[in-house]
Each structure stands twice: as structure tokens, then as C-alpha cells.
Regions:
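Active-site SXXK
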Residues: 20-46, 73, 118-122, 170-177
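A small/polar active-site loop signature that marks catalytic segments
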Residues: 78-151
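Structured C-terminal helix/loop/strand segments within mature extracytoplasmic catalytic/sensor domains
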Residues: 236-303
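Short, small-residue-biased leader/transition segments that mark boundaries at the very start
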Residues: 1-6
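Peripheral terminal and inter-domain segments
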Residues: 287-462
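Active-site helix/loop module of the DD-peptidase/beta-lactamase fold
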Residues: 21, 25, 40-78, 97, ...
Length: 462
């Protein structure tokens, strides 16, 4: 990775080895795949989508639909006034049947389905999904090994928001953008692609109060312009950013779980960037540097606070708890809303928890769950920090503590997920009450409310 780095840091239990959900940061990778395809003559940005998917068109295509090109999809200007919400196997047909109320190229509307259409076009023309197509062209030359992507119902990759990768690989890709396609002396993707992709192609609108100033600076080919002159970014929901400052020869990678993303970008551009000098030379020794290094080395999310409770630990370990609907009481809520490990923008489904049991060791507790017919065990630290465990192909970090005599608090975070799940377990005589919520603090910025649930479990009778 041919560059100097100022700092890199993570808040424990997260660290550099875990993939992070990119959300719409994925769009910049999908656009780059289109750039390579254009370079190789596989496609032209002037091609019309009606010519690429003739068998999926409505019976009488509108004149506006006939005008949509790949260029229009890249700039979020296909003419849709609303976005389709269809991940089924027929989603391409749904997109092509959606009303095109505006002439393409004249109206901006953020449209993840439009980016998915770019992924579908690439697959139609090459037989390869985005990540496979990029493997030899981008990923291997840059040494990117962690990229994965979720699939839509027809097997097309969710190029508009389904990718994950580690922070280091996000930095490599963002650095590639900053170098306009050059890597270690070789021009992998021609410079003129980035001259189009990384500059404003269409006007965008913020809100009337100016709270989202960095979303009102214009849009390129699946990347956003920033307020700082000449800067641009790959941008994913909840604060997944790869920001490029060309005149400072600087990139900044941010992975967060917040809805206050404008505040995040404002802090970067107003509190940090003014103090960055491209030709600063060797800085004199500073005692503050050591203090900052020590502080960042100890960054950690706070674990659950409380105490041990030997009496209740022994008591509850003797029982298996079964969800109330399975006990025949359909008036009580089931556990389908409980998201162990936290929710995400594209994974809001879960299965009801049928059974659970608790056991306790010297410094950890073990929560065994039967969910959707599968048995899982989560390990939670009852001392300092978090304990790691693996379940269902994912790594989880857990922390637990007794809040009161009969109330146990647990927090479980999926390491390749966005946030975490916090659960309050209140043990009663013959049952327990489980209250669950997402750790993501919602301020309504994305119109998505983190999940909350309340359900009852009873002691399983022999």
C-alpha cells in the first residue's frame, strides 16, 4: 500500500480484521467495474437499457424509458421520482415497469435500484457479477482480499449496497480513486474515467435548513462531491466514508454507526483538514503526540456495567426457557422481532427464538439459543471488555452483567454488522421477560427505526 498513514484506530471489540458493511460505498466499486467494462469495449455509457433487456420491457415502453442510458444510471438521473423496493427474482422487470416521470438526465433521484441495474448490465454482458469481474482488474492488483457482496433474488450482486470489506481494503480502493486509476506505476483504469466519475455530473439537493450540506454539492458517477474544494467521497449509510482531498494528497476512511453523518463530515472538514499541510516536512517532537497515541490505543466501547449474582446464576442455569407462543398462549408476543447482534439496512429479518438457556463460568456467561431451528451459543464476558464467539458463520462480541437481583443485561454485537443488540432479561417466578433493542441511536435521519421487542419465555416443563 504505497502511502504514508497518519493514524489508524478502531474501537474495541471491533478491529482491523473484521469486514464492515459498506452500504452505498458499494456503489463506487460497482461504478468502477463499469469503468473497466467501458475501457475494454464491453459496453458504452450511451447504451440504452431497453436495448439490453428487451424481453423484460412493458408492452408499451414510455418515451422517457426508451431514453435511459447507462450514463443516466451512473449519475442517479434515470428519471424515476420514487425508488423501487424489490429484491425478488423479478426486480429488473419491476425497475423497467416503474414510471419514468422525468426526462432522463434532467432530474436527480438517489436510486439504489439504478446501481443494481448497472450490476445487472455487467452480468448480462459478461456472465460475471461485479466482484468476480473486478477480481483480476482491481482486487488482485491492489491486494484487496476481503470484498464480499450480498445477492438479489435473481443472483445478481447487490451492487448498490450489499458489499463488505475490511477498513484497510477500503483505504486501498479510496487511494486508487485518489490516484485516478494508477497503482504502483501502472495505469489500471484510464484517467479520463475518473475525470468524469469524480466531478459533478448532476445537481443534488440538501434539506431546506441546510443540515446536509455535503449532500448538496453534486453527484458524479456513484460518488458524492464534498464542500472542501475539489474533494469527493465514496459514501455509505450510517457513516461509511472514503474521502479524497486531492490538493492535500490525503484520504480519510471512516466506518461508523451513526445517523449524524453531516456532523461527522463537518468535523472532518472543519476541525481536522484546516490543520493538514501537504508539504509540512518533518514535525518536531511533541509530548502531545505520545498522549494521543496512548489514548487511541485504548479506545473501546464500554461493556455492560454491573456485578455477579451467584444465587441467581445457579438458579436460572437449571432451566430451559421456551417462548410463550410455543407454550400455547397465543395472546403473548413471540420473539420474531429480536435481532441478536443488531440490525442493518438490508437485513431486517430474523427467526423467532424458540428456546434459550443460561450457564455461567468464572468470568463468562454462555447463552444457548434455538433460533429458526438452529442452535447457537453466544459467549459474553462478565468482567472487562467483550468475549468473542462464532455462531451461524459470523463472529460475535458479547458483554453481560447483573443490573439488579433478578435483571440480567446482555449486549451482543455482530462483528461484520452495523450495530448491536442490547437485551434486558428480567427473571420472574415461572418465566422471564426479554426486552431487546438496537444499540444504534436513532435521530430519524434515515427514516429507519432501530428494532425493539418485548417477549415472554416460560420454564420448559419436563
Amino acid at each position: 500500500f504505497p502511502t504514508r498513514r497518519s493514524s489508524d484506530l478502531w474501537w474495541k471489540p471491533y478491529d482491523e480484521k473484521f469486514r464492515h458493511p459498506l452500504y452505498s460505498f458499494s456503489k463506487s466499486l460497482t461504478a468502477t467495474a463499469i469503468g473497466f467494462a467501458e475501457q475494454e469495449g464491453i459496453l458504452s455509457l450511451d447504451e440504452k437499457i431497453v436495448d439490453i433487456f428487451p424481453d423484460l420491457l412493458p408492452e408499451n415502453p414510455s418515451e422517457n424509458l426508451k431514453k435511459i442510458t447507462l450514463h443516466h444510471l451512473l449519475i442517479m438521473g434515470c428519471g424515476h421520482e420514487t425508488e423501487i423496493m424489490d429484491n425478488s427474482e423479478n426486480w429488473i422487470s419491476t425497475f423497467l415497469h416503474h414510471p419514468v416521470l422525468h426526462e432522463p438526465g434532467t432530474f436527480y433521484k438517489y436510486n439504489t435500484a439504478g446501481t443494481n441495474m448497472l450490476a445487472a448490465v455487467l452480468r448480462k454482458k459478461t456472465g460475471q457479477n461485479v466482484t468476480e469481474f473486478l477480481k483480476s482488474r482491481l482486487l488482485e492488483p491492489l491486494g484487496i482480499t476481503s470484498l464480499t457482496c450480498a445477492l438479489l433474488g435473481d443472483g445478481t450482486e447487490l451492487g448498490g449496497g450489499g458489499m463488505k470489506m475490511v477498513t484497510e481494503d477500503m483505504a486501498k480502493f479510496t487511494y486508487f480513486l485518489s490516484r485516478q486509476g494508477e497503482w504502483e506505476g501502472k495505469q489500471l483504469l484510464r484517467k479520463d474515467w475518473f475525470e468524469r466519475a469524480c466531478r459533478k455530473q448532476i445537481e443534488t439537493e440538501g434539506d431546506s435548513e441546510g443540515h446536509v450540506k455535503d449532500w448538496a454539492q453534486g453527484y458524479g458517477y456513484q460518488c458524492w462531491m464534498c464542500r472542501y474544494p475539489g474533494s469527493f467521497r465514496a459514501d455509505g449509510a450510517y457513516g461509511q466514508f472514503g474521502v479524497v482531498f486531492p490538493d492535500l494528497d490525503l484520504i480519510v476512511i471512516l466506518t461508523t454507526a451513526t445517523e449524524q453523518t453531516q456532523e461527522e463530515l463537518s468535523a472532518l472538514q472543519e476541525e481536522l483538514i484546516p490543520y493538514v499541510k501537504k508539504e509540512a516536512g518533518e514535525l518536531p517532537p511533541s509530548p502531545l503526540a505520545g498522549a494521543v497515541k496512548a489514548r487511541t490505543a485504548d479506545l473501546a466501547l464500554p461493556p455492560r456495567r454491573g456485578t455477579r449474582n451467584p444465587f441467581m446464576e445457579e438458579k436460572v442455569s437449571k432451566h430451559v426457557y421456551v417462548s410463550a407462543p410455543l407454550m400455547g398462549n397465543q395472546q403473548l408476543p413471540d420473539s420474531a422481532e429480536i435481532l441478536i447482534g443488531g440490525s442493518g439496512l438490508f437485513s431486517l429479518e430474523t427467526s423467532p427464538i424458540q428456546e434459550m438457556r443460561f450457564s455461567f463460568g468464572s468470568d463468562k456467561m454462555y447463552w444457548e439459543v434455538q433460533e429458526g431451528g438452529k442452535e447457537k451459543e453466544f459467549v459474553l464476558s462478565m468482567r472487562r471488555g467483550f468475549a468473542y464467539s462464532e455462531a451461524d458463520g459470523h463472529i460475535y462480541a458479547g458483554s453481560a452483567a447483573w443490573r439488579t437481583l433478578n435483571t440480567l443485561e446482555m449486549e451482543i454485537r455482530r462483528m461484520d454488522g452495523l450495530s448491536g443488540g442490547r437485551m434486558i432479561v428480567r427473571f420472574q417466578k415461572e418465566n422471564l421477560l426479554l426486552e431487546a433493542e438496537d444499540t444504534l441511536i436513532s435521530v430519524g435521519g434515515l427514516g429507519i427505526s432501530p428494532r425493539q421487542a418485548l417477549t415472554v419465555f416460560g420454564i420448559k416443563k419436563d
